Amino acid sequence: VDGFFVDNTDVYYNYPQESIYDGILTILDYMNHTGRKIILNGGDCFVKKYLTTEKNVLIDGVNQENVFTAYDFSKDIYTKNDQSTREYYTEYLDLAMSHGCTAYTLEYAMDPTIRRQAAAYAGKHGYICYISDNIGLCLGR
């Protein structure tokens, strides 16, 4: 194992209680003692609180899905995010980068033009971007 990819820290968004926040910190602190890198997937509410109230010694990177793109599960279609959503995630990732984190984006798009736009957007902001044409991240359809 060369690092941890930690999912579900967005539980703090659903249950914004100090006990949840402290519990996530405890888990991350335990992982940090291994000397391995820690990348959080999502969890923007937790990460923003942590980075604005603590000295960042736990998080090496953050991954955010759907910064530029979006997936409409009800219609089963890939789309682009609206400007306000894009700006929100951009501010979040920029905050993380300003605290020493590497920012990753995971986008979902099939349209070649949207894929190029998403990659260019990530590159312009200094994010490492992966684009999948499959919401399930499967290799084959």
Q: Residue ranges of each PLM-predicted region?
A:
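Glycan-processing catalytic domains of CAZymes
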Residues: V1-R141
